[in-house]
């Protein structure tokens, strides 16, 4: 027998974790490292940095990894260093004092669902604005000490890291995260085993491990499908943020909504309010419906309870930005749910359609959210109005401005985004109640007491800090990826701290109009190369790997930045993350934003700049519509001049050039020869901090959600649940009765002839008698007047409610009086609607019949 040259079976690898141990004197460091409180407390970050500054930079400011890699000798040296040990002790005492305060039990409790959370660059479970906002929200919930928890995903690869090739092509790289080296912990059951949640996907289960992030006092639960219990088709569900095809996207949204609710249920967590931050999480309400129905309620009764305690926040300004799923794909995973709900398939999928009977229409998560959440809000005042129009087809009997779509303008977490240098200024000059009373503009007005020289010195220190950061971070990377060492060195050397520095940093979607500045290169060249008034532009941001147009913009900016006349004057900084963002929003002089109106739902990067004395130059869109104050920044008009976008771009570009040439640079460089700074510029900075910043903190945003939505919804929800859900059952029964008889309600008689020709100053009485078919005063009537205008420009002139004046059996007589005060041409009609004081608003039961 011939002997084989090799013979081996496959090894059965088993995981083993070797943990770095800390001396008992440093045991508190592990607790500190595993609570993201350090992410917004500079004393804690400085303490970790002091343990080993070089290693701290090497591990990307990740305290968990820092402690893992500290050498035995270094740990021993730390214990012997009295000054450093005192620093450790002081930080831990501050942390414990913060953590040991009991939650505010008087405020409504909230469960918050989101696809991404931006807490710190060390935990890559975010991509952009939505995630950063959600992360800031959790931090403020912790600071405000409310009863709050959140659900999201632990992504194996997170969002991509970005580099640029020698010709400016974006290179996306997905780096695997080592979960054991992250500031997270396994959520354990009573037996010490990691909690696993079994999530039903039609005909099989997906098994998600549950991890926990301690965000100060708040718990964020993260689901992870990348484990051996799942097939090769389901492990990737939590691989990448917004990764894969539409089938994987649906699987992600099932996991977030249904899996998220099952997680809370398994952990014994019940909250007053369930907040869907974007439509991705809408299926949490499907699971809640199932739970109530399993408890003995009908579908309609369950819907009353689910809607009352649910809030949907939309961040998308256009219908195309929402998620839509083909019926076949949706049925592949969701086909079992109609039976669980006790309704038909058409009724179920119709909950995600604007027109439920249109079988060609795809299922939309945002529509499902609107149909299962009592309250809906946009993320700025303008976006609230945009959302009213966007969702208007869901409530066809009402005009957009009548819809119960509210708004809460986004804010930013002050401790996270305010540079240490500014924190020290605020601590020195502002009232001691500042952090707990951030929306109090009178406190911020103390900025006027800060000497001008101190304001200027703070700004210059942060500009120098940004320049140092760029030189430290990008020198090696640019030499490695972008060739031509002489050109790289020239760029870095030409960064002039005395130049007016302008930042344009955000996601590179085409509607952000990053190209606008480059409309007239000759004019731009004169602006940046003015020897008396030099200007420098920093660009940064990622384009989605599937967005060729966005990547093309990056490539174009890179190419321009390498032209001799723009070398060191136009600079693109790759891999925009939270760390780079913090340096930029505090280090530049002006934050520029040029979105296509009205496609900026809110935008928050400009708000972060405000906290650091950085002045905004922006189109009046998103938050800046509300935030702009004359003498505290610059604005491009809100109204479009041209419908042709190309013409509008040219006009906006010319406006920006003009502002830079005639207003901004003369102001900045009007420096006093003796003082060395521009008093006029410092005045703008002070105005900006005093009059704008107080209104855009995350503290104000959280308080707005409580004041506008959480508290009132919780109060109503508790009423519906009381006495074995008595009120919920009554409302469901009433709606069923109205729905059953609605089509048979008819007009018995009417008198509206006097409305044909009216002279101003006259009062006209209109009378209708309605047969309510035994509904017992369940109908309301109103006279709706519109201004005569094109069909696509409908404006309500007046809505006049009818009063019920007489009843005879099922016949109800209503009267309304029209007071003709303003001459003009109008259209009118009479609208009939179900009337019940127990409803939160009309769109909760949007039956409408136009009669007459």
Name these PLM-found stretches:
Residues 1-852:
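Catalytic cores of carbohydrate-active enzymes across secretory and cytosolic contexts
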């Amino acid at each position: 027998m011939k002997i084989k040259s090799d013979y081996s079976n496959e090894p059965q690898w088993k995981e083993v974790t070797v943990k770095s141990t800390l001396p008992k004197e440093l045991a508190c460091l592990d607790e500190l490292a595993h609570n993201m409180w350090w992410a917004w407390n500079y004393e804690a970050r400085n303490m970790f940095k002091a343990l080993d500054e070089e290693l701290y930079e090497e591990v990307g400011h990740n305290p968990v990894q820092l402690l893992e890699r500290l050498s035995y000798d270094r740990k021993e040296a730390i214990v012997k260093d009295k000054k450093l040990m005192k620093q450790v002790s002081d930080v831990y005492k501050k942390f414990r004092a913060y953590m040991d305060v009991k939650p505010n039990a008087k405020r409504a409790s909230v469960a918050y669902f989101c696809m991404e959370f931006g807490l710190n660059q060390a935990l890559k479970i975010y991509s952009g604005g939505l995630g950063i906002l959600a992360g800031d929200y959790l931090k403020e919930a912790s600071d405000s000490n409310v009863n709050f928890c959140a659900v999201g995903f632990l992504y194996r690869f997170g969002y991509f890291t970005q580099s640029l090739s020698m010709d400016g092509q974006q290179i996306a790289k997905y780096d695997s995260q080592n979960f054991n080296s992250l500031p997270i912990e396994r959520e354990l059951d009573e037996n010490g085993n990691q909690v696993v949640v079994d999530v039903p996907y039609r005909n099989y289960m997906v098994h998600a491990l549950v991890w926990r992030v301690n965000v100060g006092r708040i718990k964020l639960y993260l689901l992870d499908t990348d484990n051996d219990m799942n097939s090769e088709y389901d492990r990737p569900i939590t691989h990448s943020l917004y990764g894969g095809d539409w089938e994987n996207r649906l699987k992600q949204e099932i996991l977030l909504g249904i899996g998220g609710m099952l997680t809370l249920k398994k952990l014994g967590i019940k909250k007053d309010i369930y907040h869907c931050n974007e439509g991705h999480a809408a299926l949490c309400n499907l699971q809640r419906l199932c739970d109530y129905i399993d408890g003995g309620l009908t579908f309609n009764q369950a819907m009353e309870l689910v809607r009352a305690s649910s809030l949907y926040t939309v961040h998308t300004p256009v219908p195309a930005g929402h998620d839509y799923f083909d019926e076949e794909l949706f049925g592949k995973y969701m086909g079992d749910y109609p039976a669980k709900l006790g309704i038909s398939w058409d009724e179920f999928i119709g909950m995600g359609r604007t027109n439920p009977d249109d079988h060609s229409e795809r299922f939309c998560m945002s529509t499902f959210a609107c149909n299962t959440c009592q309250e809906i809000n946009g993320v700025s005042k303008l976006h609230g109005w945009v959302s009213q129009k966007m969702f208007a087809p869901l409530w066809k009997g009402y005009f957009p401005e009548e819809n119960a779509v509210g708004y809460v303008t986004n804010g930013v977490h002050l401790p996270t985004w305010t540079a240490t240098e500014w924190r020290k200024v605020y601590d020195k000059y502002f009232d001691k109640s500042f952090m707990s009373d951030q929306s109090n503009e009178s406190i911020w007005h103390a900025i006027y007491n800060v000497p001008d020289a101190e304001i200027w010195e703070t700004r210059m220190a942060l500009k120098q800090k940004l320049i140092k950061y760029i030189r430290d971070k990008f020198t090696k990377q640019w030499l490695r990826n972008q060739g031509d060492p002489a050109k790289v060195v020239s760029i870095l050397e030409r960064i002039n701290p005395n130049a007016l520095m302008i930042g344009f940093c955000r996601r590179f979607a085409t509607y952000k109009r990053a190209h606008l500045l480059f409309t007239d290169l000759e004019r731009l060249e004169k602006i940046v190369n003015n020897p008396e008034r030099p200007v420098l532009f920093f660009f940064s941001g990622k384009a989605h790997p599937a967005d060729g147009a966005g990547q093309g913009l990056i490539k174009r900016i890179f190419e321009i930045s390498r032209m001799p006349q723009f070398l060191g004057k136009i600079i693109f900084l790759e891999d925009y993350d939270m760390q780079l963002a913090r340096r930029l929003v505090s280090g530049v002089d002006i934050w520029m934003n040029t979105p296509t109106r009205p496609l900026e739902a809110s935008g928050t990067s400009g708000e972060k700049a405000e906290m650091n004395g950085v002045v905004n130059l922006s189109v009046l869109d998103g938050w800046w519509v509300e935030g702009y104050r004359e003498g505290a920044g610059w604005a491009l008009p809100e109204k479009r001049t041209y419908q042709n976008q190309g013409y509008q771009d040219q006009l906006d570009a010319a406006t920006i050039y003009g502002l830079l040439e005639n207003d901004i640079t003369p102001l900045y460089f009007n420096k006093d020869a003796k003082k060395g700074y521009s008093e006029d510029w410092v005045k703008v900075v002070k105005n900006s901090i005093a009059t704008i910043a107080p209104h855009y903190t995350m503290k104000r945003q959280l308080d707005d959600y409580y004041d506008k939505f959480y508290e009132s919804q919780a109060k109503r929800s508790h009423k519906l649940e009381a006495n074995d859900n008595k009120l919920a059952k009554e409302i469901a029964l009433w709606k069923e009765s109205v729905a059953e008889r609605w089509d048979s309600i008819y007009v018995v008689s009417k008198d509206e002839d006097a409305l044909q020709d009216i002279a101003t100053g006259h009062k006209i009485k209109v009378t209708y008698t309605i047969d309510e078919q035994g509904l017992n005063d369940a109908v309301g009537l109103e006279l709706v007047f519109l201004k005569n205008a094109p069909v696509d420009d409908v404006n309500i002139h007046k809505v006049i409610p009818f009063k019920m004046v007489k009843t005879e059996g099922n016949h109800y007589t209503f009267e309304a009086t029209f007071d003709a005060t303003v001459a003009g041409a109008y259209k009118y009609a009479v609208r009939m609607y179900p009337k019940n004081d127990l409803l939160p608003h009309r769109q909760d039961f949007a039956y409408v019949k136009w009669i007459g």
